[in-house]
């Protein structure tokens, strides 16, 4: 039974499942013990987001770690990127208890080795799975806080990367915390950076009472759009549940895609270096890639997933990494992704530009794009094969199927966590885009 559950919850780059079904305290204990055995260090950083099952998960996971006499560096209720940054700063392995943007009945774990080195399918996660698949005596005790919270180190790290003085106090923006964990760090960030901000849904509530903490679904951005437009703000940002991803909108309430953000940030950061390397995943749009190429940015393509992009960034010594899903990675942040750091860099970018954000975006002439659309399918591989058979163009199979045609481009790939196809389309016109989407949907 445990083995079947482990098969369900161990994904390509994290652990995720329905709490009380495929994931429970016994399994969390075994994973904690396995993780502690896998990493060589005697001290492990542990934090969690605001999910309703997190205290039970924390008790079980930390009990597993302590069962082999290793110590917990507890950092409390924090975003995922706080654990990553502290793992890099302290050179200690880390774990964050979270299921990111998934519904409230889910929970899980993201793990990293010392130095914020990701633990994924090909970098130790399956070894941890094997270690967890054993019959062991389970003794779960209430976790006792050891008061080792290292928040100051994290905030000092952010200040070194983006100083408060570099951000204009004239910027007015909106934040939708989505009732996720960003609300737990907002006050401290605000005290440091003196934001001129209007905010909604900052109360951490694992029931997500206002809308799902998934900003990739544009329907969840309605309240933020209204906030920005009604108050004539410069931009807005919506965070997901563990605040490692933030989706931006411009002053007109239009979503700024991950591809657009990859261009904006790389163009801004590359002005500070003669040679600038960017790792991108397969669904960053060709238009975005062409803009970066024309700016003499060195580009490296990889599969979707934070462990994949972080590994390639280390391999090629990249400065920045961008995903169309709005995860952004920085060499100066131990190659880890950080929505909070992205917000600060974006504000610094706007502080150096007098134009409205909508005008900045329009000057790039991005063609119509679909955003990420999900299709539930029975067989992912068969569905991708069907799509390939009905299109002509230049195909790439780095991750799923990408098709480059003279009038359009698309990428279709299987989800790593669900039986779904994730589809992104870009086309010269909205009419062509609609035709491509209709052709894809009718084939599957």
Model-derived features: positions:
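An N-terminal, well-structured beta->alpha segment
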Residues: 1-63, 67-69, 144-171
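Gly/Ser/Thr-enriched, mixed-charge loops and adjacent short helices
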Residues: 107-229
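Phosphate-binding and adjacent anionic-ligand microenvironments
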Residues: 273-444
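Glycine-rich phosphate-binding loop
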Residues: 94-106, 228-250, 255, 299-338
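Short glycine-rich phosphate-binding loop at a beta-alpha junction
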Residues: 43-49, 73, 172-174, 276-282, ...
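N-terminal small/polar loop signature for handling phosphorylated ligands or for N-terminal nucleophile
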Residues: 44-107, 189-249
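Gly/Ser/Thr-rich active-site loops/lids in small-molecule metabolic enzymes
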Residues: 199-201, 254-273, 339-348, 352
């Amino acid at each position: 039974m445990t083995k079947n559950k482990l098969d369900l919850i161990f994904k390509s780059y994290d652990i995720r499942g329905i709490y009380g079904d495929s994931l429970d305290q016994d399994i969390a204990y075994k994973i904690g013990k396995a993780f502690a055995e896998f990493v060589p260090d005697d001290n492990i950083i542990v934090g969690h987001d605001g999910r309703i099952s997190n205290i039970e998960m924390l008790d079980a996971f930390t009990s597993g770690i302590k069962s082999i006499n290793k110590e917990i560096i507890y950092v409390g209720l924090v975003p995922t990127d706080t654990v990553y940054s502290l793992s890099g700063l302290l050179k200690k392995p880390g774990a964050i208890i979270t299921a990111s943007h998934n519904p409230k009945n889910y929970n899980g774990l993201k793990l990293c080795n010392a130095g914020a080195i990701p633990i994924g399918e090909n970098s130790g996660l399956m070894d941890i799975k094997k270690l967890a698949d054993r019959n062991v005596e389970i003794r779960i005790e209430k976790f006792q806080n050891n008061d080792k919270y290292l928040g100051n180190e994290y905030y000092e790290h952010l200040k070194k990367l983006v100083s408060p003085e570099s951000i204009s106090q004239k910027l007015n923006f909106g934040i939708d915390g989505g009732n996720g964990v960003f609300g737990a760090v907002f006050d401290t960030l605000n005290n440091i950076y003196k934001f001129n901000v209007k905010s909604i849904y900052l109360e951490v509530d694992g029931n997500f009472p206002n809308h799902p903490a998934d900003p990739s679904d544009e329907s969840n951005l309605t309240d933020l759009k209204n906030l920005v437009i009604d108050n004539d703000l410069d931009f807005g940002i919506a965070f997901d549940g563990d605040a490692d991803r933030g989706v931006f909108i411009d002053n007109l309430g239009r979503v700024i895609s991950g591809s657009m953000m990859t261009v904006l940030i790389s163009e801004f950061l590359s002005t500070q270096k003669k040679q600038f390397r960017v790792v991108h995943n397969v669904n960053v749009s060709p238009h975005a890639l062409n803009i970066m190429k024309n700016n003499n940015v060195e580009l490296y393509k990889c599969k979707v997933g934070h462990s994949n992009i972080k590994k390639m960034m280390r391999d090629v010594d990249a400065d920045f990494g961008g995903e169309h899903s709005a995860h952004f990675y920085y060499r100066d942040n131990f190659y880890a992704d950080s929505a909070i750091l992205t917000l600060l860099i974006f504000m610094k970018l706007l502080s150096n530009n007098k134009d409205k954000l909508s005008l900045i975006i329009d000057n790039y002439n991005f063609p119509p794009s679909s955003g990420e659309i999900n299709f539930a399918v029975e067989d992912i591989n068969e569905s991708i094969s069907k799509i390939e058979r009905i299109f002509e163009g230049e195909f790439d199979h780095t991750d799923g199927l990408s098709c480059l045609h003279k009038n359009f481009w698309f990428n279709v790939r299987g989800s790593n966590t669900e039986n779904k196809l994730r589809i992104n389309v870009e086309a010269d016109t909205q009419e062509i885009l609609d035709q491509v989407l209709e052709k894809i949907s009718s084939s599957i």
